């Protein structure tokens, strides 16, 4: 147990967690493989997964997240104008997390969620970097 410096799976071949920490996103979160080994532990009600992204400048702070708690998903976006001391915030809850897709790795794939017909949040990793779509 200690610092990891190379990419690895968060769940090992026996379905157990590879303990340790990393200074950057190195873990592949293959929950499908883990769930097939330990169904009782990885039930839909026990898994908590999220993706969070933020940008901070001297004048503006922006943050967005998609959290899936098993029984509920939450979409949140914040924009804080530091100079004017104005906060804009939008939050939506999705019962049972229906339609929420979380990528297995923060540096690959797409994480997205839609609440109703108009609220949409997506994080997409491309060769150019992470793209965020908010509707």
Please place each PLM-identified region on the residue numbering.
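Targeting-peptide/extracellular-domain and disordered-appendage signature
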Residues: 1-135
């Amino acid at each position: 147990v200690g610092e990891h410096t190379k990419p690895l799976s968060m769940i090992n071949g026996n379905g157990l967690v590879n303990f340790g920490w990393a200074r950057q996103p190195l873990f592949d979160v293959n929950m499908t493989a883990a769930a097939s080994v330990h169904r009782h532990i990885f039930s839909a009600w026990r898994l908590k997964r999220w993706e969070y992204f933020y940008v901070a400048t001297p004048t503006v702070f922006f943050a967005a997240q998609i959290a899936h708690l098993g029984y509920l998903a939450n979409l949140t976006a914040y924009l804080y104008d530091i100079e004017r001391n104005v906060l804009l915030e939008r939050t939506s809850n999705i019962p049972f997390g229906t339609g929420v897709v979380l990528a297995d790795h923060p540096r690959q794939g797409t994480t997205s969620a839609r609440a109703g017909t108009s609220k949409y949040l997506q994080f997409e990793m491309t060769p150019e970097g992470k793209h965020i779509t908010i509707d």
